[in-house]
């Protein structure tokens, strides 16, 4: 992000897309050197295939998919509009990239120290905490009087809520879904989250175009409160 912001500020924005294309080519070259993994198609696997999607009938799983739909949609929307909010508050593009860089470091610290709290609290408690963090973050963005408040909020809260929810997702899915279906269940949630991101990006764009980014953040805070209620 830091490099992309520097490119946008000091060179041509088109150079960003060229760099992404080069990175993609390098990734493809790297994968060419890996070994293929062979999968065996046994009769036992075929017999179990019919039960692979039985989790779709589990009420707890369906509820979690809905909760994830709300959370991921707002989280992705925040990733798009929080840098724009900082620019509206007067920050240059390069400084915005620096803030995003350090907020990612905070995310890494949450991951590294997750062992201290992930097994000490229930999934519901952790999920409520993630929603509470997002509500506080969105309300602070919506009411930020200057860039300083928004920057501090971004550094402290931007990555914590989303990272925490991602870790909770795996914990809860493993608790409500049979072991053989965990990967499929996570895949369904991932697809749902992708649809949520597309829908929320469109709705968010319409709302910002007709009102303001601050109104958008008030709306997202309301959706996160709805998610908290569903979690209860």
Residue ranges: model-predicted function:
Residues 21-40, 230-232:
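C-terminal membrane-cytosol helix-exit motif in multi-pass small-molecule transporters
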Residues 8, 110-122, 208:
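Helix-to-loop junctions at the C-terminal end of transmembrane segments
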Residues 6-22, 206-224:
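A membrane-interface helix-boundary motif in multi-pass transporters
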Residues 181-210:
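A late C-terminal transmembrane helix in Major Facilitator Superfamily
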Residues 35-64:
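Juxtamembrane intracellular "pre-TM" segments in multi-pass secondary transporters
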Residues 61-98:
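Extracytoplasmic gate region of multi-pass secondary transporters
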Residues 164-177:
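Intracellular juxtamembrane helix-capping segments at the cytosolic ends
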Residues 125-140:
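Structural signature of the two symmetry-related core transmembrane helices
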């Amino acid at each position: 992000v830091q490099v992309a912001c520097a490119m946008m500020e000091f060179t041509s924005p088109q150079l960003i897309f060229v760099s992404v294309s080069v990175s993609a080519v390098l990734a493809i070259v790297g994968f060419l050197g890996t070994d293929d993994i062979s999968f065996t198609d046994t009769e036992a696997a075929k017999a179990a295939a019919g039960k692979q999607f039985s989790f779709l009938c589990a009420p707890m799983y369906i509820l979690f998919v809905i909760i994830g739909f709300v959370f991921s949609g707002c989280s992705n929307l925040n990733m798009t509009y929080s840098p724009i909010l900082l620019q509206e508050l007067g920050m240059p593009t390069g400084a915005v990239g620096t803030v995003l860089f350090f907020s990612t470091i905070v995310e890494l610290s949450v991951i590294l120290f997750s062992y201290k709290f992930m097994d000490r609290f229930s999934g519901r408690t952790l999920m409520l905490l993630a929603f509470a963090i997002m509500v506080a973050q969105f309300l602070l963005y919506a009411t930020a009087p200057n860039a300083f408040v928004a920057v501090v909020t971004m550094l402290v809260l931007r990555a914590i809520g989303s990272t925490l929810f991602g870790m909770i997702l795996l914990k809860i899915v493993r608790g409500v879904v049979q072991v053989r279906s965990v990967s499929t269940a996570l895949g369904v949630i991932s697809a749902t989250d992708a649809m949520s991101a597309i829908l929320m990006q469109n709705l968010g764009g319409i709302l910002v175009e007709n009102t303001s980014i601050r109104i958008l953040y008030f709306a997202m805070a309301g959706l996160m409160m709805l998610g908290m209620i569903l979690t209860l």
